């Protein structure tokens, strides 16, 4: 995920994000999920640094392996990162035939790159990540995630994703994947209408976008706005899907899956299934989470969310 700014309570001499209430525990506290916190026991702090954009920390947890934290908010853990990375990448790419050019916005840890590289039809993978430190730290501490950078099809651009998109020729990409963090601070722009308009312009007719779209348990007001914007901009298909990620707030995260006008895209029925046996080699390892059955099921919504999201289409 890309940069975000969050306020956090609790501090010790070790790190401002180690809880003063539960010594030796990392606690994730944010105005985006008031009244609750998620905590992991810290075995050892492995890295702390401050980039031009955010505070970066890596720690060894007792139960989820190594953990990457940006401005006090968990971005990934070794144990459950597969549930996010595999779904945000394969939901769009398995829904269109033979994707060739893919753009990743954010995703500095390299996990989305790893998943995109499983698709043999892909010829070009561009990634624009704003924070070079995230890339470097991920390569050092999360080699099984950052392995995506080793693919020769990958072109890394360090810079602002919004500006990058504005300079892209119209109709360049088959798919755009936006691996952003929460809509606060530097990532705020990645949830606003002009950004979605830039994505639509950068996609070919019938091209697809997959973007992080928050939790139905915490952010229905944000999701409502995103859905409304997407329905105005993407004239093909607009859908909300979700996955479970234990270390994300509320234990789940959603995605917007949209297509531009052109060849029809039915996201709920994957036409480009990825063969797990053929999708990995010794470098990447097998997929741990995504499969075609889960792909279809991810678009099934609880009634309360379904009512709100469907109402935005009327």
Swiss-Prot record:
One of its GO terms (biological process) is spermidine biosynthetic process. Putrescine binds at residues 84, 179-182, 248. Pathway: Amine and polyamine biosynthesis; spermidine biosynthesis; spermidine from putrescine: step 1/1. S-adenosyl 3-(methylsulfanyl)propylamine binds at residues 54, 85, 109, 129, 160-161, 179. Keywords: Polyamine biosynthesis, Spermidine biosynthesis, Transferase. Signal peptide: none annotated. Root, stem and leaf. This is Spermidine synthase. The active site is at 179 (proton acceptor). Residues 23-260 form the PABS domain. Its EC number is 2.5.1.16. HAMAP family: Spermidine_synth. It holds the Pfam family Spermine_synt_N. Belongs to the spermidine/spermine synthase family. Transmembrane segments: none annotated. One of its GO terms (molecular function) is spermidine synthase activity. It catalyses: S-adenosyl 3-(methylsulfanyl)propylamine + putrescine = S-methyl-5'-thioadenosine + spermidine + H(+). It is an enzyme of class 2 (transferase). One of its GO terms (cellular component) is cytosol. It comes from the Eukaryota.
């Amino acid at each position: 995920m890309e940069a975000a700014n969050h306020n956090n309570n609790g501090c010790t001499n070790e790190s401002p994000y180690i809880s003063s209430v539960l010594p030796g525990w990392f606690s994730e506290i944010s105005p985006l999920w008031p009244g609750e916190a998620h905590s992991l026991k810290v075995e050892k702090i492995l890295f702390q640094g401050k980039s031009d954009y955010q505070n970066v920390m890596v720690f060894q947890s007792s139960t989820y392996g190594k953990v990457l934290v940006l401005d006090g908010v968990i971005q990934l853990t070794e144990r459950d990162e597969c549930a996010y990375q595999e779904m945000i990448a394969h939901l769009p790419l398995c829904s269109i035939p033979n994707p060739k050019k893919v753009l990743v916005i954010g995703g500095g840890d390299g996990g989305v790159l790893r998943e995109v590289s499983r698709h043999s039809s892909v010829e070009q993978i561009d990634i624009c990540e704003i924070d070079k430190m995230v890339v470097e730290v991920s390569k050092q501490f999360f080699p099984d995630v950052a392995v995506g950078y080793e693919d020769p099809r990958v072109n890394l651009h360090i810079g602002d994703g919004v500006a990058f998109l504005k300079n892209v020729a119209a109709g360049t990409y088959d798919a755009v994947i936006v691996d952003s963090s929460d809509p606060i601070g530097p990532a705020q722009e990645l949830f606003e209408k002009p950004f979605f308009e830039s994505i639509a312009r950068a996609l070919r007719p019938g091209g697809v976008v997959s973007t992080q779209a928050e939790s139905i348990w915490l952010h229905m007001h944000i999701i409502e706005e995103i859905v409304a914007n997407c329905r105005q901009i993407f004239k093909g298909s607009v859908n909300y899907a979700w996955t479970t990620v234990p270390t994300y707030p509320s234990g789940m995260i959603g995605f917007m899956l949209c297509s531009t006008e052109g060849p029809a895209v039915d996201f709920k029925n994957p036409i480009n299934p990825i063969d797990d046996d053929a999708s990995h080699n010794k470098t990447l390892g097998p997929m741990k989470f995504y499969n075609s059955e889960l792909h279809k099921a991810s678009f099934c919504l609880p009634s309360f969310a379904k009512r709100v999201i469907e109402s935005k289409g009327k």
